[in-house]
Curated annotation (Swiss-Prot):
ATP binds at H14, D175, G176, K177, R242, F243, D251, R257, K258, A274, K278. Pfam families: S-AdoMet_synt_C, S-AdoMet_synt_M, S-AdoMet_synt_N. Its EC number is 2.5.1.6. Mg(2+) binds at D16. The keyword Glycosyltransferase does not apply. This is S-adenosylmethionine synthase. Homotetramer; dimer of dimers. It comes from Thermosipho melanesiensis (strain DSM 12029 / CIP 104789 / BI429). Disulfide bonds: none annotated. One of its GO terms (biological process) is one-carbon metabolic process. Residues 98-108 are annotated as: Flexible loop.
Amino acid sequence: MRRLFTSESVTEGHPDKVADQISDAILDAMLEQDPRSRVAVETLVTTGIAIVSGEVTTRAYVDIQDIVRKTIMEIGYTRAKYGFDGETCAVLSSIHSQSPDIAMGVDKALEAKEGELNAQDDLELVGAGDQGMMFGYATNETKELMPLPIMLAHKLALKLSEIRKSGTVPFLRPDGKTQVTVEYDENDRPVRVDTVLISTQHEPNVTIAEIKEALVKYVIDPIIPEELRDDNLNILVNPTGRFVLGGPSADTGLTGRKIIVDTYGGAIPHGGGAFSGKDPTKVDRSAHYFARYVAKNVVAAGLADKFMIQVAYAIGKAKPVSVMINTYGTAKIDEDKILKAVLELFDFRPGAIIKKLNLLRPIYKKTAAYGHFGRELEEFTWEKLDMVDELKRLL
């Protein structure tokens, strides 16, 4: 049966993404001075104000006000007429230390306390910072080994931001959203793009026709592949007819409100934990990254066309309480053998994940817009394919 599947993305100027970027900018500043910082920072942005709160244990000193203002201005909120700008907005901060009850379980995992863990350094003693389920996914339908709808949505959103910042289209403002609907055939392969939706904030003195003409030329045409387009492609631009008031002045933004945009666009389940503002002892972040790393290497090794992995943790324990895989019937060998190889080759303890992916670095602000997965940046170690040969050798 043919099916349609849709995913969305947002620009860096979307209020929720403004909040994510502020939280991760603060995290990076702390990790830069003290790589062992424990950070859980939440941000709220609304008309004329940014509020930062959370739990932090660190030896670093960072200027929260300065980081917040610089981040907002880098995004593009630099003019008071936008209703929100980095120079004039108020910044409130309420940050306190991490609960000692949580810290005792993170500092030394339950297995270490009971003598079951042979750790080579103190990092390997780390217990999970919370309970929860984390998912990783990969599919060979794109070169990034990501679902096509979310990759196209991210690329459209990034291109929209690029033409705004470059001045190519001078009437654009920072807030924006994209959405892509892809048609899949009976073999579950993408065959065409059915609908492209772009909503972008703009100056008041421009018409919908002018906006649509510019976005088709500078955003849609460069991003949507010709082989996936036909005469029935449905293009929607600012369907409400007007999008002048936007950003935090029109829609309050919160850290962690775009978890489906951050991951796989709804192609697989999500455990609910957000990423931004959290240091890597929080398995909400590090285990999601590691699960993507595992899934991508399995698919790249040719063991399956699609691969999902679920990993679940208990707070204070290092080893996961469960690991489950699903190849959706695309496995090239027995799934039990794939699972056995995954468990043999990949160490899912939080400390081991941090070491393997080198996560105690100030790399997180880059993740906070346009997707945590599918972008092969040097800092994104979870996108590396350095376990492919090991998987092939074992199987």
